[in-house]
From Swiss-Prot:
A lipid is attached at residue 625 (S-palmitoyl cysteine). The chain crosses the membrane at residues 606-626. PANTHER family: BC035947 PROTEIN-RELATED (PTHR10424:SF72), VIRAL ENVELOPE PROTEIN (PTHR10424). Residues 266-307 are annotated as: Disordered. This is Envelope glycoprotein. A motif (YXXL motif) lies at residues 650-653. InterPro entries: FMuLV_rcpt-bd, TLV/ENV_coat_polyprotein. A motif (CXXC) lies at residues 334-337. Residues 1-31 form the signal peptide. The lineage of its organism: Viruses, Riboviria, Pararnavirae, Artverviricota, Revtraviricetes. Residues 470-490 are annotated as: Fusion peptide.
């Protein structure tokens, strides 16, 4: 700050606006609802920048968002790169060695190529960073009791601090703007995001400076309010000024967070949402071999990139394989149906043993699965975190995470269903900092099981049920299979994993494609993305129905299955079965019924001409009678009118009595 306009008293005052500032900041800070699972690991880089927004210092690590707040230790001279000329580093490149020769000790000639005595007094306006001697003097200034440095916040400061100025005064235009630093009055604040202090003591910094290296390391720590802020991606700015006699040299520095997803996201095609609309690929026939078959473990070949039809067919095939291995009697003849409306998946809570990892497993860095929420979870299983009372019915065992930072990976065939979404692994740091909770579940696609008679009756239109038959889903038939829960006839371990291997692969592929669809929809239709996704699944099933690959039963798309597997041309199979039932039905009909069934055109002709014939017959029968009545009515009316007309043209003569005439005479 300028000594010509401002005095420099020792600071021991408390800002009376402090409590109000805390309330304002708490009212403004709220966690950002990011489009990622809070347990997903990202590559995070905290960067310290100079006035030109060039990165001059950085630290990198792999952590979940908003859980890693390391101490930042840049050098004071690094912040002055390309800064004001009195720092002497206007032409110094970032991350380059410090300039200038070393300073000389009292014994002349002890340091070859030295310049200036290390003990020479500091003069005003001397560059502070361009030589080892100046850096040593700068270190003594920052550690001196009556000198030091102070830091003022930039644009993120409250409104009452408008008098603090802008970058031209390093945000320190008046006293009271400083919030941290190393000075005799110990500047502090209850609302700023960082604190700044010396990283080295004066005794530690002196030999480092004499060795011609950066020796004015700072320690920048995040405050509690700074750890609550989620605007670090755009960055925040501060001004730093030295507290010396005369003019206070200053500089501008910033702090920002760079977030890099560890997994690649490369779109292919003009529209990633619809680019996978392709016909089903024909299955490859296995090569002919004359060798004697031997028992080998089940291995699945690497499938080609699946389109919509293939993904949905793979779900049905995986469901059939799991059902056939566990309940062969149910697959003698059946229909497996995909539901066109949500929910598309069901969760079954299970008990399992997860694995602990001190470093993030590979699946923790996979693209976020948070966008899929399980609307139906049944059973009782393992819960982690602060489970609310409304969801404690799902918990057989609730485990609290202890202190420390580690990761909980779900066992094979399961996934963590959290209040923030689906994730393959958890970060205990996130669970300890939040009130999140998770349940270990098996994920089953919404595939319903129907008997053949029910399907045939629906298409024939002769079925009359007092109530809708209960639909059996995979979650009811196979729930708990992976962890050896209620599956009858199948043991745990390898057999259970083999039974669900193809189904799990199909579920994984379908979830991945659904996530991609939601991600693309969110970019343009934030509020309507869920509705569009539901219509998308309905259109996918409509494509299958129109292509004859499945039979549409109400809101479901059904595939015929028997011991030969899932039939791809389900409509052809349905027509074949319906024709057989039609022939059986016709064999029991009389000649009159067969007449109509054998000649469809005759039924159409009769129904077409029957109406006009009946109308014509009624006209012929009732027409003459009605016409006579009408003519007679008209004649009667006309005669009455004629009589009225005649009476108006003539007057009635008065009758004369002869006797009266005689009496008058």
């Amino acid at each position: 700050m300028e000594s010509t306009t401002l005095s420099k008293p020792f600071k021991n005052q408390v800002n009376p606006w402090g409590p109000l500032i805390v309330l304002l900041i708490l009212g403004r800070v709220n966690p950002v609802a990011l489009g990622n699972s809070p347990h997903q690991v990202f590559n995070l880089s905290w960067e310290v920048t100079n006035e030109d927004r060039e990165t001059v210092w950085a630290i990198t690590g792999n952590h979940p968002l908003w859980t890693w707040w390391p101490d930042l230790t840049p050098d004071l001279c690094m912040l002055a790169l390309h800064g004001p000329s009195y720092w002497g580093l206007e032409y110094q490149a970032p991350f380059s060695p410090p300039p200038g020769p070393p300073c000389c000790s009292r014994s002349s000639g002890s340091t070859p190529g030295c310049s200036r005595d290390c003990e020479e007094p500091l003069t005003s306006y001397t560059p502070r960073c361009n030589t080892a001697w100046n850096r040593l003097k700068l270190s003594k200034v920052t550690h001196a009791h009556n000198e030091g440095f102070y830091v003022c916040p930039g644009p993120h400061r409250p409104r009452w601090a408008r008098s603090c100025g802008g970058p031209e005064s390093f945000y320190c235009a008046s006293w009271g703007c400083e919030t941290t630093g190393r000075a005799s009055w110990k500047p502090s604040s209850s609302w700023d995001y960082i604190t700044v202090s010396n990283n080295l003591t004066s005794g530690q910094a002196t030999p480092v400076c004499k060795n011609n290296t950066w020796c004015n390391s700072l320690t920048i720590r995040f405050t509690s309010l700074g750890k609550q802020a989620t605007s670090w991606v755009t960055g925040h700015w501060w001004g730093l000024r030295l507290y010396v006699s005369g003019h206070d040299p200053g500089l501008i520095f910033g702090i920002r967070l760079k977030i890099t997803d560890s997994g690649p996201r490369v779109p292919i095609g003009p529209n990633p949402v619809l680019s996978d609309q392709r016909p089903p690929s024909q299955p490859r026939s296995p090569p002919h071999s004359n060798s004697t078959p031997t028992e080998t473990p089940l291995t699945l070949p690497e499938p080609p990139p699946a389109g919509v039809e293939n993904r949905l067919l793979n779900l049905v095939k995986g469901a059939y394989q799991a059902l056939n291995l566990t309940s062969p009697d149910r697959t003698q003849e059946c229909w497996l149906c995909l539901v066109s409306g949500p929910p598309y998946y069901e969760g079954v809570a299970v008990l399992g043993t997860y694995s602990n990892h001190t470093s993030a497993p590979a699946n923790c860095s996979v693209a976020s699965q948070h966008k899929l929420t399980l609307s139906e979870v049944t059973g009782r299983g393992l819960c982690v975190g602060a489970v609310p009372k409304t969801h404690q019915a799902l918990c057989n065992t609730t485990q609290n995470t202890s202190g420390g930072s580690y990761y909980l990976a779900a066992p094979a065939g399961t996934i963590w269903a959290c209040n923030t979404g689906l994730t393959p692994c958890l970060s205990t740091t996130v669970l300890n900092l939040t009130t999140d909770y998770c349940v270990l579940v098996e994920l089953w696609p919404r595939v319903t099981y129907h008997s053949p008679s029910y399907v045939y009756h629906q298409f024939e239109g002769r079925a009359k049920y007092k109530r809708e038959p209960v639909s059996l889903t995979l979650a009811l038939l196979l729930g708990g299979l992976t962890m050896g829960g209620i599956a009858a006839g199948v043991g745990t371990g390898t057999t259970a994993l083999v039974a669900t291997q193809q189904l799990q692969a199909a579920v994984h592929d379908d979830l991945k494609e659904v996530e991609k669809s939601i991600t693309n929809l969110e970019k343009s239709l934030t509020s309507l993305s869920e509705v569009v996704l539901q219509n998308r699944r309905g259109l996918d099933l409509l494509f299958l129905k129109e292509g004859g690959l499945c039979a549409a039963l109400k809101e479901e798309c059904c595939f015929y299955a028997d011991h030969t597997g899932v039939v791809r041309d389900s409509m052809a199979k349905l027509r074949e079965r319906l024709n057989q039932r039609q022939k059986l039905f016709e064999s029991g009909q009389g000649w009159f019924e067969r007449l109509f069934n054998g000649s469809p055109w005759f039924t159409t002709l009769i129904s077409t001409i029957m109406g006009p014939l009946i109308v014509l017959l009624l006209i012929l029968l009732l027409g003459p009678c009605i016409l006579n009545r009408l003519v007679q009515f008209v004649k009667d009316r006309i005669s009455v009118v004629q009589a009225l007309v005649l009476t108006q043209q003539y007057h009635q003569l008065k009758s004369i009595d002869p006797e009266e005439m005689e009496s008058r005479e």
